[in-house]
């Protein structure tokens, strides 16, 4: 029929297309949808597709001026969720033309924009995204890559060790630098600014950068190893952030840091570009992620935030510990850890991976395990994360009864013992405690650490189960 037909029509007539063959260039999304009572799955799934792509709530005259078939999002498959009567997974395909090249901000504004406030839905969670190769290639991604980082640091065949300086707020710059020096001298590879250390009245950023650089060079001279401190460049404006990164580069330090969710993807991508151009490694902290990813039925799963970070750029990202004080179910965590590190990841629903993802030549990101871990966790961490990871012991280093440097020694000895045992073919999962006990016989620092944290366990059920 010719002409324009006004009025509201069912979304599913246009946007639910179960026979659609997805294209290699489509961005694919898996949403966990909880519709309001009485809204059928096809209609709810189609509603998600329309509201996150071309449509609005009614037909409009200007629809006739465009090719809807070319630009519309399509809900192409719906599957039930085991054990959840009210939820289902809706798969939506978006044509690549809907997205600006090289912009995570634009991708998210479309896919997880207004649609999350949609009345016909009780709750909505983005579980996974398949980023097509054609779109991946429009991003620079991480400034360096895992191999490049190892070459810069001259550290091979083991995880890297870090430590967040505590108390996180209140130290003067000089005392802060002293804590950095003690940890690095004792055997850590990195120390870290806490995510909320920016430039507060008690310690302005420039003073901190200076004293930390002094600590790094002093520790390097003493140990003969390359050291680093994640200088947090996060700031109130992008210009100020870049100014801090420039100062770090002038000091000659190896690495800076950014809070990518609070700082925002636009700022993060700018910083990642600066870091690649100037040879700085970039450590990424995920402060605020739990606001977005912790609820099972609403929000965005962390694996999507991790993919977005790999596109935006970062060399390290915090990704949970599986064993410490923060959320993380083992299989799910390993799923997004591999998404960060590997070039190609097969679809595997047992690990929460809904789509096969090919990253082509985008560099990988080192996962950082941090939060409530100590020397007794070392065998499990080495086993779970493997060599390509950063293990961060904040309280687990600084809380050592003989203070920071011995705390660092204990952590390094435990790590080297675990790596050696693994290389000799021992089973870390089964013999972990035994390996640590043996090592502590010839390291008084480790023995003292083992004594303090004998039986600490954080026993809660993880909320993020499949």
Swiss-Prot record:
Catalytic activity: 2 (2R)-3-phosphoglycerate + 2 H(+) = D-ribulose 1,5-bisphosphate + CO2 + H2O; D-ribulose 1,5-bisphosphate + O2 = 2-phosphoglycolate + (2R)-3-phosphoglycerate + 2 H(+)
GO biological process, one term: reductive pentose-phosphate cycle
Site location (Transition state stabilizer): 325
Modified residues (N6,N6,N6-trimethyllysine): 5
Gene Ontology CC annotation, any one: chloroplast
Keywords noted in UniProt: Calvin cycle, Carbon dioxide fixation, Chloroplast, Disulfide bond, Lyase, Magnesium, Metal-binding, Methylation, Monooxygenase, Oxidoreductase, Photorespiration, Photosynthesis, Plastid
Chief localisation class: plastid
Binding site for substrate: 114, 164, 168, 286, 318, 370
Entry-linked CDD domains: RuBisCO_large_I
This protein's record includes keyword Magnesium: yes
Residues annotated to bind Mg(2+): 192, 194-195
Bound cofactor: record note: Binds 1 Mg(2+) ion per subunit.
EC number: 4.1.1.39
Named cofactor requirement(s): Mg(2+)
Additional information: The basic functional RuBisCO is composed of a large chain homodimer in a 'head-to-tail' conformation. In form I RuBisCO this homodimer is arranged in a barrel-like tetramer with the small subunits forming a tetrameric 'cap' on each end of the 'barrel'.
Protein name per its UniProtKB record: Ribulose bisphosphate carboxylase large chain
High-level lineage: Eukaryota, Viridiplantae, Streptophyta, Embryophyta, Tracheophyta
Underlying gene: rbcL
């Amino acid at each position: 029929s010719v002409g324009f037909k006004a009025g509201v029509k069912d979304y599913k007539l246009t946007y639910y297309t179960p026979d659609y063959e997805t294209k290699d260039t489509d961005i694919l999304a898996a949403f966990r949808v909880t519709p309001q009572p009485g809204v059928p799955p096809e209609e709810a799934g189609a509603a998600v597709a329309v509201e996150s792509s071309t449509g609005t709530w009614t037909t409009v005259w200007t629809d006739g001026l465009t090719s809807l078939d070319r630009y519309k999002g399509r809900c192409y498959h719906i599957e039930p969720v085991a054990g959840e009567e009210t939820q289902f997974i809706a798969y939506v395909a978006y044509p690549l033309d809907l997205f600006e090249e090289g912009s995570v901000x634009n991708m998210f504004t479309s896919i997880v924009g207004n649609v999350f406030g949609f009345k016909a839905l009780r709750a909505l969670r983005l579980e996974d995204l398949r980023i097509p190769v054609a779109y991946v290639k429009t991003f620079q991604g991480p400034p360096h890559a895992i191999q490049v980082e190892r070459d810069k640091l001259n550290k091979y065949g083991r995880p890297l060790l870090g430590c967040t300086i505590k108390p996180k707020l209140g130290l003067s710059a000089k005392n802060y630098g002293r804590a950095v020096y003690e940890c690095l001298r004792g055997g850590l590879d990195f120390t870290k600014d806490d995510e909320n250390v920016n430039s507060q009245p008690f310690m302005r950023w420039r003073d901190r950068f200076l004293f930390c650089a002094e600590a790094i060079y002093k520790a390097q001279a003493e140990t003969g190893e390359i050291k680093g401190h994640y200088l947090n460049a996060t700031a109130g404006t992008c210009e100020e952030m870049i100014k801090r990164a420039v100062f770090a580069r002038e000091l000659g330090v190896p690495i800076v840091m950014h809070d990518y969710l609070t700082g925002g993807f636009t700022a993060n991508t700018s910083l990642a570009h600066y870091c690649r151009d100037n040879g700085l490694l970039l450590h990424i902290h995920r402060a605020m992620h739990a606001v977005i990813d912790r609820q099972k039925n609403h929000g965005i799963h962390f694996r999507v935030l991790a993919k977005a970070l790999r596109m935006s750029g970062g060399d390290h990202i915090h990704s949970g510990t599986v064993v410490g004080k923060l959320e993380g179910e083992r299989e799910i965590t390993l799923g997004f850890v591999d998404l960060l590190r590997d070039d190609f990841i097969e679809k595997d629903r047992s690990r929460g991976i809904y789509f096969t993802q090919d990253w082509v030549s985008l560099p990988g990101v080192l996962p950082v395990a941090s939060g409530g871990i100590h020397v007794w966790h070392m065998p499990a961490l080495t086993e779970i994360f493997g060599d390509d990871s950063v293990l961060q012991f904040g309280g687990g280093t600084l809380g050592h009864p003989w203070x920071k440097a011995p705390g660092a020694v204990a952590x390094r000895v435990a790590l080297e013992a675990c790596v050696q045992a693994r290389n000799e073919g021992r089973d870390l999962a089964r013999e972990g405690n035994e390996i640590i006990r043996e090592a502590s016989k010839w390291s008084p620092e480790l023995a003292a650490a083992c004594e303090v944290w004998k039986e600490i366990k954080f026993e809660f059920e993880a909320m993020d189960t499949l």
